[in-house]
Regions:
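N-terminal signal-anchor/start-transfer transmembrane helix
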Residues: 10-23
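Hydrophobic transmembrane alpha-helical segments in integral membrane proteins
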Residues: 1-13
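Short, hydrophobic transmembrane alpha-helix segments
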Residues: 1, 58-65
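A generic, lipid-embedded transmembrane alpha helix
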Residues: 44-60
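Physicochemical signature of membrane-embedded alpha-helices that form the seven-helix bundle of GPCRs
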Residues: 7-10, 48, 77, 144
Length: 168
């Protein structure tokens, strides 16, 4: 139970930190005329993403967390995913928010992880979920969370691509 509680605290502290960054960036973007597409799934993601962690950590707290070896594998995946996410945030700078906000006359970011992939932040999100699922031995909520968030991310990517003029 202590491991689950500690994991919960780490996840919450990092989420709050990310939310603060997002809100600051959002204010600047809105003040400078950034456009938000109407069909975004932000509201749904705002609930599903944190509830996924609550569910996985609760499952781990109730039924026991993973063995030390699997916990370490999960922690390594989680930390690697967070590193990728913060690299993506640093590369996007003020453009990174939880919402899809497109600045006026913006050019594509092609530095950092964006040199190799279009949406590294979402790869990181799936990595975060996988890492916590492994740490918590959350077989049920982990699978449900990864599939559910994966479907939302797929929709979100299509919204972002249309908003940025990248239709594939």
């Amino acid at each position: 139970m202590q491991v689950a509680l500690l994991t919960f605290l780490v996840v919450v502290v990092v989420m709050v930190f990310e939310a603060i960054i997002s809100r600051r960036h959002e204010k600047v973007l809105r003040d400078t005329g950034a456009i938000e597409p109407a069909e975004d799934v932000y509201v749904l993601m705002q609930a599903v993403y944190p509830l996924s962690f609550v569910g996985m950590i609760t499952e781990g707290g109730l039924f026991g967390v993973a063995s030390y070896s699997w916990w370490m594998v999960g922690a390594a995946i989680f930390l690697t995913a967070k590193a990728l996410k913060f690299w993506a945030i640093a590369s996007l700078g003020i453009r990174w928010t939880f919402r899809v906000l497109v600045p006026i006359n913006a050019s594509f970011v092609q530095s950092g992880p964006y040199r190799w992939v279009l949406h590294p932040n979402y790869i990181a999100v799936i990595g975060e979920l996988l890492g916590v699922a492994l740490m918590m031995k959350a077989l049920v909520t982990g699978v449900i969370s990864i599939i559910g968030c994966g479907l939302l991310i797929a929709k979100r990517i299509s919204v972002e691509n249309r908003a940025l003029g990248r239709i594939r």
